[in-house]
């Protein structure tokens, strides 16, 4: 198992620079500790999620972070394609590929509630139709040796091209919802499936099953190692200490994101911190408890390649969050490294 970071920025600082500096501090630390990749949240197209310190342009942040780090790969998590012209996205990605010396990963998605978002006007096409065509057009712009004509359902043009072309063959991550079509497209194109921390363990298992089946259909050897799964992870001395540091901040965020966990007829009062720990959304406590929690989820879903630690939040203090990352990489990650989701499973005698 590899370890990555999902910098899911949500600190509610009055000054954006304060949050950006803290996010940079975490990325720099992650790079020093050997964390392999970081996906940087891009929030700027959905009115209900607006905060004074949100990051509406992850690419700019990534280019600055690249000058302060050595090995970590970074990508936006994600660019909502229906709100941009695909050639602009293709160009932005190519430039970032050059500016990061090939450490840039493209991150695409439909966007949260794209159809009802009026901040940039009403979309004239179905957002998923726009997303699919945008992906095809971006790939064409990256790969076409000569200017090309495009006559799609959404975009049309003649002699299109981008300058510069990408320097490398970038990895592309797709924000995967529980939609079959998104997971199937991800497998069809050979992209990386990015799974947020909000799906239940059962939903992650189902999403991985759809992805693996779709990989098989396109004739590829299905590889669970390409799947990225996010979870809130916090390492300290005890579960009690973790609850004290995490409870207020994370419950406030969870109320807006975890409605699917509330039982029929229930309310936010059912989203207790203890229940969210029991359901595997928050994995916290001493190193052994954290390892066991991650291993249990890994086994329940059938394995995955990269665990994305959720950062960019306002729980505890910056020092506590950094200490958690340091302890995780020193005391938990080495034990997880032995997990290989693509290794054939050997059935026990009891089975």
Where are these regions (language model features)?
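N-terminal beta1-alpha1-beta2 module of alpha/beta enzyme domains
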Residues: 1-68, 72-73, 168-170, 346-351
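Glycine-rich, proline-tolerant flexible connector loops at the mouths of alpha/beta enzymes
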Residues: 37-61, 80, 112, 199, ...
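Flexible, glycine-rich active-site loops centered on histidine and acidic residues
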Residues: 2-16, 82-149, 192-193, 199-201
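Conserved, mostly hydrophobic/aromatic
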Residues: 3, 42, 65, 96, ...
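An alpha-helical appendage that flanks or caps ligand/catalytic pockets
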Residues: 125-161, 202-305, 337-351
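N-terminal small/glycine-rich loop or linker at the start of catalytic domains
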Residues: 1-15, 71, 113-116, 155-168, ...
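Active-site mouth loops of central-metabolism enzymes
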Residues: 7-21, 79-87, 168-178, 279-285
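Hydrophobic faces of well-ordered beta-strands that scaffold small-molecule active sites
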Residues: 3-7, 38-40, 74-76, 104-108, ...
């Amino acid at each position: 198992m590899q370890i990555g970071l999902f910098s899911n920025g949500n600190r509610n600082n009055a000054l954006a620079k304060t949050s950006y500096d803290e996010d940079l501090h975490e990325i720099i630390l992650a790079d020093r500790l050997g964390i392999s990749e970081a996906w940087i949240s891009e929030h700027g197209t959905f009115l209900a999620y607006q905060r004074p310190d949100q990051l509406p342009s992850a690419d700019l942040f990534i280019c600055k972070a690249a000058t302060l780090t050595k090995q970590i790969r970074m990508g936006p998590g994600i660019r909502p394609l229906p709100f941009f012209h695909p050639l602009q996205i293709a160009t932005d990605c190519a430039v970032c590929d050059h500016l990061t010396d090939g450490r840039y990963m493209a991150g695409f998605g439909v966007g949260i509630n794209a159809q009802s978002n009026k901040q940039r006007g009403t979309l004239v096409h179905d957002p998923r139709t726009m997303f699919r065509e945008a992906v095809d057009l971006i790939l064409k712009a990256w790969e076409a040796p000569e200017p090309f004509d495009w006559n799609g359902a959404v975009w049309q043009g003649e002699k299109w091209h981008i300058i510069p072309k990408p320097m490398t063959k970038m990895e592309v991550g797709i924000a995967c919802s529980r939609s079959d079509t998104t997971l199937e497209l991800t497998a069809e194109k050979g992209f990386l499936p990015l799974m947020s921390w909000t799906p239940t363990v059962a939903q992650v298992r189902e999403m991985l099953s759809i992805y693996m089946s779709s990989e098989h259909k396109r004739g590829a050897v299905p590889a669970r190692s390409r799947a990225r799964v996010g979870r809130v992870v916090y390492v300290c001395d005890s579960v009690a200490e973790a609850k004290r540091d995490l409870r207020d901040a994370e419950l406030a965020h969870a109320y807006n994101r975890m409605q699917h966990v509330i039982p029929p007829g229930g309310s936010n009062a059912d989203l207790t911190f203890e229940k969210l720990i029991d359901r595997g959304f928050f994995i916290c406590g001493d190193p052994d408890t954290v390892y066991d929690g991650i291993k249990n989820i890994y086994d329940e879903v059938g394995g995955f390649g990269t665990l994305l630690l959720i950062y960019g939040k306002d729980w505890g203090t910056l020092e506590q969050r950094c200490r958690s990352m340091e302890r995780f990489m020193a005391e938990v990650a080495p034990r997880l490294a032995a997990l290989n989701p693509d290794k054939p499973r050997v059935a026990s005698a009891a089975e």
